[in-house]
Amino acid sequence: MAKKSMIAKNKRPAKFSTQAYTRCEKCGRPHSVYRKFQLCRVCFRDLAYKGQVPGVTKASW
């Protein structure tokens, strides 16, 4: 989990567009965030297995 101060800082608009970065909406993790879902890989995997991410199914071949 990210610090509450870092999550609050990320919610404020950045002064310049280059300062903006993605964070996971669920846990606040700054690395490995899927932009389409706004979730990190850990949270994405957890929610996908539970079936809570619409349009995502387990791959089988």
UniProtKB/Swiss-Prot annotation:
Q: Which residues form a coiled coil?
A: none
Which superkingdom, per the lineage? Bacteria
The record's GO CC annotations read: small ribosomal subunit
* Cofactor binding notes: Binds 1 zinc ion per subunit.
Q: Which keywords appear in this protein's UniProt record, sorted alphabetically?
A: Metal-binding, Ribonucleoprotein, Ribosomal protein, RNA-binding, rRNA-binding, Zinc
Question: Which Gene Ontology BP annotations are present?
Answer: translation
So where does Zn(2+) get bound? Answer: C24, C27, C40, C43
Please give the Pfam families that the UniProt record associates with this protein.
Answer: Ribosomal_S14
The coenzyme or cofactor needed here is: Zn(2+)
Q: Name one GO molecular function term.
A: structural constituent of ribosome
InterPro entries named in the record: Ribosomal_uS14 (IPR001209), Ribosomal_uS14_bact (IPR023053), Ribosomal_uS14_CS (IPR018271), Ribosomal_uS14_sf (IPR043140)
Quaternary form?
Part of the 30S ribosomal subunit. Contacts proteins S3 and S10.
Family as reported in the entry's similarity comment: Belongs to the universal ribosomal protein uS14 family. Zinc-binding uS14 subfamily.
- Describe the task this protein carries out: Binds 16S rRNA, required for the assembly of 30S particles and may also be responsible for determining the conformation of the 16S rRNA at the A site.
Q: What is this protein called?
A: Small ribosomal subunit protein uS14B
Native organism is Streptococcus agalactiae serotype V (strain ATCC BAA-611 / 2603 V/R)
